Each structure stands twice: as structure tokens, then as C-alpha cells.
Design a protein with these regions (language model features):
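Walker A (P-loop) ATP-phosphate-binding motif of ABC ATPase nucleotide-binding domains
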Residues: 5
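Conserved substrate/cofactor phosphate-moiety recognition/catalytic segment
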Residues: 21-66
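Loop/turn-to-beta-strand initiation segments
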Residues: 74-78, 101
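Conserved phosphate-donor/acceptor-positioning beta-strand/loop module used by diverse small-molecule
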Residues: 96-115
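Small-molecule kinase domains that catalyze NTP-dependent phosphoryl transfer to phosphate-bearing small molecules
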Residues: 118-157
Length: 175
């Protein structure tokens, strides 16, 4: 498959936004953070420590899918940071898209807990991490990256192992 974009997935605190932003910068592609697309109601629930239900997520996933489709249709290349914890969520994200590669940032509960408990100013509370691990359905066919690696190393490996259309990399920055 020729890669036209990426979805970088995993539980909260695994480094999705950091890796996706760095990857987008390296490739000259469009960084999208799924957190920026949550409704105020969803953010309020998460701030209160209430895990989102599938029905809470449905409009958010539809909006993300529309954004992926419109970005690709405009000839751009999206790099989306999104939890995408369940297979059904990933199916909705990938609907009517072509060439998106799924990257799964995998790490232990203890490592991610240590990261998320140090994070300041994020609406996702550390106490909700357990619910994310419980909801997580590990993906099949994703490029799995060990989050013990530094973000730059993860991005280097993604770029090295992905099959790009050379014209999509015309603005790639040197490493």
C-alpha cells in the first residue's frame, strides 16, 4: 500500500500527539489532534473523570473521518493522533479513505501511568487510564511501535518502514 497518511493510536499518555506532530513536521504533512475535535460535553465528562461511551464518541469519530476524507481529497496528507481504542472506532475512521497507515504506540500500564501522572493541564485524568486499557482492542495489521523508544526514533522507524509515493515527500525535511 502507498501511504497517504497516518493514524497514530494508543491509550492516553502513550505519546500519540508528540509522535504524530513530529512525523507530520518531518514529512511536511498535516498534523491533526483528535482531542481538538471533541465536543465541550465530551471534554466536561473527561474532566469530571467520566469515561466516554460509544454513543459519546460516535459524532466525534464521524467528524474525524470527514476531516480525513477532506484532507485527502484536497491532495494533502493527514497525520491524525487519535486513541482509536476499539476496532469499531478504527473502522469508522478508515471509512472511505485510501492509503492510511495505522501506527499503534504500545507501552505498559506502569510506564504510561508514570507519564500521564506527570502531565499538567490535560483534561484526561490519570485515574481514567485503567478504563482506556480495559477498552483497548489491540489492532491487527498496524505498525506497532514500542514507546520506550524516543519519539524521534519512533518517527525514524515509521518513515523507514512505510511505502510512500515519492511526490508526497517533496517537502520532507532532512533528518
Amino acid at each position: 500500500m502507498i501511504v497517504n497518511g497516518f493514524i497514530v493510536m494508543g491509550v492516553s499518555g502513550c505519546g500519540k500527539s508528540t509522535v504524530a506532530r513530529l512525523l507530520a513536521e518531518r514529512l511536511g504533512w498535516d498534523f491533526l489532534d483528535a482531542d481538538d475535535f471533541h465536543s465541550s460535553e465530551n471534554i466536561s465528562k473527561m474532566e469530571a473523570g467520566i469515561p466516554l461511551s460509544d454513543s459519546d464518541r460516535a459524532p466525534w469519530l464521524a467528524l474525524l473521518n470527514e476531516k480525513l476524507i477532506s484532507t485527502l481529497a484536497a491532495g494533502r496528507h493527514p497525520v491524525l493522533a487519535c486513541s482509536a481504542l476499539k476496532e469499531s472506532y478504527r473502522t469508522k475512521l478508515f471509512h472511505e479513505t485510501n492509503g492510511l497507515q495505522l501506527i499503534y504506540l504500545k507501552g505498559s500500564y506502569d510506564l504510561i501511568w508514570s507519564r500521564i501522572s506527570q502531565r499538567k493541564g490535560h483534561y484526561m485524568k490519570p485515574e481514567m487510564l485503567r478504563s482506556q486499557f480495559e477498552a483497548l482492542e489491540e489492532p491487527v495489521g498496524a505498525l506497532v511501535m514500542d514507546i520506550r523508544l524516543a519519539p524521534k526514533e519512533i518517527v525514524d522507524e515509521i518513515i523507514k518502514t512505510s511505502n510512500f509515493n515519492p511526490s508526497s515527500l517533496s517537502s520532507q525535511k532532512p533528518t
